[in-house]
């Protein structure tokens, strides 16, 4: 199945033009969501690459703010996006922290039949990111989730490894999928933040908390629709702010908890304890993990 899927559900050199995809919309509407938390340095340039699509391929461009304390909102608005706070997106539900929460709330703040998610910390993103993500959804029957894949450069101490990024993906997510959901081995970037889905799908599945959201959506889609409901598209190169290993370890803990949950395996629910050098001593710090999904949005906002 994996080999066939790579042939007919994976695009390495997609040839769609924006005009082709506009014609393929056939009355469907498209929303683009940028989740953001203190991304003043990059959010404006990401918005600027998508704004030219407004009024044509894209009907709605929203930055969903997760409580930024910098100039994220100011710069996003100046670049041409509508900014919605996590509180305003779903005022009847008190917000929780984390990326999964913001993406879940974005379903209530948008109206598109198709929703594309793009991370707001990207550096020099290709203006074709969104069109490529939309391609399979607009041109192929039965596809409900499209994942982007790409080369991921990593900068460390001034040096760059052209393919060294995606450390949590390569060290945690893909090995675990090989063990627990081997059918998803063919998905190159299971944790990638650039993806698109139909509202029909996204509002019918739970959203995992924090950085578990991407792996949760992927496994839930596979369990509901099989590989034929998923596609992937080559977006070229994706560069963003590289995070320190301490942050990636906390992220990994949430990814593991979510994947175990989706596979019916009990997780301890115990947070990750990390030890930080302090002179000759080591100071423990604990980062929490959450096992509490948000319910399908259709249970709160039936369409």
Curated annotation (Swiss-Prot):
- This chain belongs to the protein called Glucosyl-3-phosphoglycerate synthase
Q: What EC number is given for this enzyme?
A: 2.4.1.266
**Catalytic activity annotation:** an NDP-alpha-D-glucose + (2R)-3-phosphoglycerate = (2R)-2-O-(alpha-D-glucopyranosyl)-3-phospho-glycerate + a ribonucleoside 5'-diphosphate + H(+); (2R)-3-phosphoglycerate + UDP-alpha-D-glucose = (2R)-2-O-(alpha-D-glucopyranosyl)-3-phospho-glycerate + UDP + H(+); ADP-alpha-D-glucose + (2R)-3-phosphoglycerate = (2R)-2-O-(alpha-D-glucopyranosyl)-3-phospho-glycerate + ADP + H(+); GDP-D-glucose + (2R)-3-phosphoglycerate = (2R)-2-O-(alpha-D-glucopyranosyl)-3-phospho-glycerate + GDP + H(+)
Function per UniProt: Involved in the biosynthesis of 6-O-methylglucose lipopolysaccarides (MGLPs). Catalyzes the transfer of the glucose moiety from a nuleotide sugar such as UDP-alpha-D-glucose to the position 2 of 3-phospho-D-glycerate (3-PGA) to form glucosyl-3-phosphoglycerate (GPG). It can use UDP-glucose, ADP-glucose and GDP-glucose as sugar donor substrates with decreasing affinity and with 3-PGA as an acceptor. D-glycerate can only be an acceptor with ADP-glucose and at a very low rate.
Identify the keywords attached in UniProt to this record, alphabetized.
Glycosyltransferase, Magnesium, Manganese, Metal-binding, Transferase
Q: Relay the pH-dependence remark from the record.
A: Optimum pH is 8.
Protein's gene: gpgS
Which parts of the sequence bind (2R)-3-phosphoglycerate? 166-169, 242
Question: What are the required cofactors?
Answer: Mg(2+); Mn(2+)
Positions contributing to UDP-alpha-D-glucose binding = 35-39, 66, 99, 119-120, 211-214, 238-243
Q: Which family does it belong to?
A: Belongs to the glycosyltransferase 2 family.
Cofactor binding note from Swiss-Prot or TrEMBL: Requires divalent cations for activity. The maximum activity is observed at 20 mM of MgCl(2).
Q: How does activity depend on temperature?
A: Optimum temperature is 45 degrees Celsius. The activity is undetectable below 20 and above 55 degrees Celsius.
Which effects follow disruption of this gene?
A: Disruption reduces growth rate and results in an 80% decrease in the production of methylglucose lipopolysaccharides (MGLPs) directly attributable to a drastic if not complete loss of GPG synthesis.
Tell me, how does this one assemble? Homotrimer.
Name the positions where Mn(2+) binds.
Answer: 121, 240
Under Pfam families, the record lists: Glycos_transf_2
InterPro entries assigned to the protein according to its UniProt record, in alphabetical order? Glyco_trans_2-like (IPR001173), Glycosyltransferase_2 (IPR050256), Nucleotide-diphossugar_trans (IPR029044)
Q: Which GO terms describe its molecular function?
A: glycosyltransferase activity; metal ion binding
